């Protein structure tokens, strides 16, 4: 054991923590953080200060990463203009000098946006499960449907309500917390969805066939499978007639097709066909097909579609590729040759073109994206430069970009209007079919305020029989969707193990206190708890800084200014306190106990008595500004100007420095508001001379207040009966200020226009957008390109530029404690009693989403399992991982690698295995799932008798066919580039027969994690595994 960890929390330990904290306390000199890179020219390590880091976190971003809109004009060989169009052009950064700078956009994380396994709720959580459906009319006499279920969130023992509201404008999905003591009514659910007025109260629908109709409504969100055009263009070809007339492709083009997927024979093809003829070869003999993260993709390849020498325009080829939303154009020739332009293609339907060039000399691909102007922004943004030397990485990036692009196109006005008309027609038709039956059967109508999870007490047996029939029909529908290939099971066939940027690192295990707030101090963390303010670092014993007589509710450590600012809340005696960090450090040397409230009398800012909130400007390049809210009064405080020695920021020439910095602060002005603010944020003006703004939220509105004049302007009015303000976050797009306003389930981005001649301009901007969270958050963190919403039991991650969902992680008892730089949070973990530190990860493995619980496990255990204890760990998400400022992320996560869970209803503990990509296996996998599930539904389970002998024989035949198709048995599973499926042979292997190499992979991960925190119990455990959960991976067909 490290000698520093022995004994009590004495002076030796305090000096150990302070040595880490005071690395920046030599009178405010900020240490530099070194981040390694792979670039040989940058091998000398890039230095980034915390202040630069803060600027990146708080939202200094640019949409230019996603291209700029240009007017593109195409002309023929004679120079005559043919067509013109406005497209957003993405070609990576064009700044040649940016490659050597540390803050450049070198690479991006590749994520599917709005993935179906997170968005198709009805298929995933409702279909085939007991749930309730309601029908009603809103105040405008438009019909709506409501579906409600009570479910366990990803088998994490977190029960919650899920609700879907179906309207002609689209669907709205929310999660509501479950409380065994608090009942929930349909009225309260609709009120949470901001639907409070009705023409008639909703009535429950008991027909089990309603599940089929609601599944059709959900499928209007878009197909889970995709068809993309692939057009081959020779060097110098400038018209679509020339490109479509290429009878055969080049060797490089064939290599590109092999990278995209498998060449399949269309005749007799039973998978997703993408509109191609699979019976009579009228659309060609072969095509290219792949499966990516559960999405089936068919490519309409121009050289594989029928060619006609008599038809110069190649109408048959244009009929397919011209009707694809997304088209890949593979262009041969040097970079200097005439480039492709979208206006060369005559199509009113194609909105996105991906221009691919192959450099044979350097064996790399270059990518350029053209998007029609009306298509919303979508990621991932192209790296700089947009050149891919790793072909597999290029394939993943291209497929994700194309899938996200097609989804974004469906949000354009043209497609959105069509979808709205279709939804309106379907909902009205369904309403007219159901209402006569509902009027006849009034006895089954439940009260508008009935508790949802309870069934009627009368006719119990009849109700149970109805629910059984309801579930049976729903599971049959789910089976049909799977066999048809329309199941949104994206994570059921994940790709290679991938480390996500939001993966947490365990900062402190078994944290025994309730954390209130915190802020980093050097490498340590200053945490306000129920036991006082503690200095925490890893698993070393905590050092007390302030005792419990000073209940701190807000805290800011300003290392560059040698300041500690905190708000101690004790009723009317609440105040702001300011300390010198150097003085706090000096006082801790040799001290066994923290300072009491009486020891801090000299550090009070007296005029802040009774304050309930304060905010500081997060950019410290200018003077420090603090705005304190005392009921409905705002008090602006700044630090007095004083001379500084050159090169040493934050150090006064006053000699000697007083221990308390109270005298250095001055009160500038008071501003009166009409109510007490619940949320407050400071917005920097565009220049030093311009006015700064204060954003405040109270009543039903967000206002901005001019710091100089106190004049208030309405920014946004909230149309809701009840408002829960969450946050106002200042973000800066290309230097221009904007605000993310968060309340209830909503998040709105508003551009803050600068002052003009003393008056504030408020006008709608094309860059404004709005989206809804799935669960009501209590805190929001902006770390471009991500927005992280923290709820009581989950973390929802979206993109700043468009609000699209990229991931939802289940984190029981999640509590955010710090987010000004790195993100720190506490979360509950369950471990076995008596388990050693080295085995804590394995001991808690049964609570991981990777391992589905046994069938006899109760859905919502009221208490912990036998031999289990619950503790809280303190976790850290490094900011530099999120903002993506380095080519390789420098910090090593203790999380184990992502494991692929088989998409079957039987939860097998499969170890980490390589994924094979074989076309025949993917189809066979679906057939085996379907046949196995069909036997279950028909009651033909393999329980003894002659049935038990058939399964092994079929299984052995399957394995034999697979070995023959692959040229004999293989000792290892090899990954190819065409599909992300798991072979059925592996899926049916029990956990004890899993790939031994996969088992070793787990072991090596644990050993690596143990290197960083030797002897720390459970240091590698995580509150949530950032891979597919069992509920996401496993399509439950029981």
UniProtKB/Swiss-Prot annotation:
Residues 512-824 form the CNH domain. Residues 214-430 form the Rap-GAP domain. GO terms for biological process: regulation of small GTPase mediated signal transduction. Pfam families: CNH (PF00780), Rap_GAP (PF02145). InterPro entries: CNH_dom, Rap/Ran-GAP_sf, Rap/Ran_GAP_dom, Rap1_Ran_GAP. The keyword Phosphoprotein applies. Residues 833-863, 937-1038 are annotated as: Disordered. Gene3D superfamilies: Rap/Ran-GAP. Residues 1019-1028 have a biased composition (Polar residues). The modification Phosphoserine is found at residues 68, 449, 455. Keywords: GTPase activation, Phosphoprotein. PANTHER family: GTPASE-ACTIVATING RAP_RAN-GAP DOMAIN-LIKE PROTEIN 3 (PTHR15711:SF62), RAP GTPASE-ACTIVATING PROTEIN (PTHR15711). This is GTPase-activating Rap/Ran-GAP domain-like protein 3. It comes from Mus musculus (Mouse).
